[in-house]
Amino acid sequence: RREADHIVVAAGAWSHYLARTLGDHIPLETERGYNTTLPIGAFDLKRQLSFEEHGFIVSPLTTGIRVGGAVELGGLKLPPNYSRADAMLRKAKMFLPKLKIANGRQWMGFRPSLPDSVPVIGPATQSSRVTYAFGHGHLGLTQSAGTAKLVAQHVMGETPEVDLFPYRAQRF
């Protein structure tokens, strides 16, 4: 058993299970995104390329090239459908004929998403000692620093820079 003055629930796609134990029923669904990281030398790319109409992005990394995108509502229990990653690789090769698509490492990640596309940030309904911070969908990494700042302000008893009312769990 552990004790704490305050708990922050930021468990991604599993957060709604924890919230339910506190009486908050949050309709979180899991978007699944796919990517393939190709090894160094797969393509000489200096900046990210976005193929929005085709549903994928090609990004340079220190570890190679990443081809990623796709959205699939598949929950937490279904096995990955890597044919989605394969399809993005084929499309990328079509646009970048010199792209070497062999020896890639495929990955699937969970994106905790809500029906209104607005994350849950703020106190639990039944306990002011629990703060929620989840449901950012495919913008989780992008919005994480801003959410962390708001949560820290809230937990420390400060007035957050942004009104947390629109982000409350009770809106569902």
Task: Show where each model-derived region lies.
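Active-site substrate-recognition segment that forms the wall
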Residues: R2-S128
